[in-house]
């Protein structure tokens, strides 16, 4: 976590890009898990979900860093990239919550 009192809009944007990148990689893994289920390749699902979770953990840590800075009263000039990152992260977390259910439907 940064010790600066105020982060620049560019710094915050870079954190937003990281959240987009890691949650985007997680989303890709989760969608691939669903495709594997569709093809009957159920043995690949757990590894893909594990990979997704690792990326989500990193993205979530970045989000937590921003929340902690906000709670400390730091001035955060939040731009659209950070908002986009938050959207990516939350929708991917939702996808992870339901991916096993979707795969189970294909199993039947």
Please name every model-derived segment.
Residues 1-108:
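Terminal alpha-helical segments
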